[in-house]
Amino acid sequence: MLKYVVTDIGKMCLYIWPYRVWSWRRLFIFRVLNVVSIAILFETPHRLALVPNVCLYTHMAIPLSTCLFCLCLCICIKYDITQTQANNQRNLSLLFSVFHLVFSTIALSIYCIYQILILVKH
């Protein structure tokens, strides 16, 4: 259990770091590819046994944070927030990171409770 938590905290950091480094287009492609990969995993549940460190909270956090990313991107387009406005871009990048961290924490808690319930049943 601890191994999975440590592994997925590492994954969470990997999902957060591009927010500060990448452009809007690269970041959008990155998020879309994440959602597509999760969708493929959900369509083939028998393969999940072959990927032991794919945790429930990762599956939950990525689509949720991607939806928020798309929402914030639409807000940026509506209010004409461009890349030249560096302060706004940094603030939004930080906001995306916080959203992802919050959803990951909530989903990690749900995952831990789920694992405890499985252990109690056995």
UniProtKB/Swiss-Prot annotation:
GO cellular component, one term: membrane
Additional note from the record: Partially overlaps HMLALPHA1.
Keywords from the UniProt entry: Membrane, Transmembrane, Transmembrane helix
Subcellular location: Membrane
Keyword Ubl conjugation part of the UniProt annotation: no
Any coiled-coil regions, as ranges: none
Species assigned in the record: Saccharomyces cerevisiae (strain ATCC 204508 / S288c)
Transmembrane segments: 21-40, 57-77, 94-114
Organism superkingdom: Eukaryota
Topology in the lipid bilayer: Multi-pass membrane protein
Name this polypeptide is given: Putative uncharacterized protein YCL065W
